[in-house]
Amino acid sequence: MEKEFFKKIKLLNNFSLLVILTFVIFISFGISKTRFLTNGNESNYHIYPISIPKKVSFAGEEITLDEDDLIERMDKEFLVNTYWQSNTILLIKRANKYFPQIEKILIDEGVPTDFKYLALIESGLENVTSPSGAKGFWQIMKTTGKEYGLEINSNVDERYNLNLSTRLACKYLKKARDKFGSWTLAAAAYNRGMNGVQNKIENQNQTAYENILFGDETKRYVFRIIALKNIVESPESFGFYIDEAQMYKPIEFKEIKIDKPINNISDFSKDLGLNYKNFKILNPWLLENHLNNNSRKVYTLSIPLDKI
């Protein structure tokens, strides 16, 4: 009898604990939900589609969005890049840091400044390596880099040199523009290759990017560039509010020339008043802790402005 009594008490306690735990979870969920839905006002929390313009432009060339296919392709890129908020905020911040340097080179090379957005979608403005082996901001393959005069070996990889790789991209884009008569097709060729674009033009008897049936990646390519261009140029229109103080600051640097080997980059950096990390951030194309340079080639090194 006594054991039965205590057994009932134990069951009652377990039931009470379960009720209390359920209540706590319910309240916690309600609080979390309320906080997520903008301070409890659920009517203020909405996700909206993006208004698609009737026309978009890239490098001074207009694309009229007058077909369902074109509208849906443009809509996809606007939606993906608007609602992948964390990535797009990073892209906007990095654009503030690197675009001034890239724009100067594009202008100097006679290439429309809209092409800075090509680098943005290629790499996110990071020195990344693709599964196929393309490297740097402009995602240059080893064969292409060497063809256009970049030094690429175990000691130096100039695909990571922003100045030289941007100038290479400009040479390629101008060559493609001369071949196809269109900056838009030049951008497509940067992704698909000039031969690939030429084959599509000949097989389909079309000369406008938007009228050519490309594979999935290339058919998205220019529309992705255009979407990021619109978002970065007018972030508030897409719901991105970033204070100027939160932007990544442009790099201020000067250049020095060197035509001899560097036996130890750590010591070399220290002599300039830098640590190894900061020196390599500005000169990522130097792959090792030394520079061979037996040929006495003239290299250009980037040094923080306050260290000159």
Model-based region annotation:
Residues 133-154, 166-168, 173, 197-200:
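Substrate-binding/active-site groove segments that recognize
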Residues 216-239:
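Catalytic cores of secreted or luminal carbohydrate-active enzymes
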Residues 244-273:
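Primarily a LysM-type cell-wall glycan-binding module
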Residues 84, 88-99, 108-111, 130-138, ...:
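Solvent-exposed, acidic/flexible segments
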Residues 2-110:
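An acidic, Gly/Ser/Thr/Pro-rich helix-cap/linker signature
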Residues 282-308:
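Extracellular LysM carbohydrate-binding repeats and other cell-envelope/extracellular binding modules
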Residues 173-200:
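Catalytic and binding regions of secreted/periplasmic enzymes and modules that target cell-wall glycans
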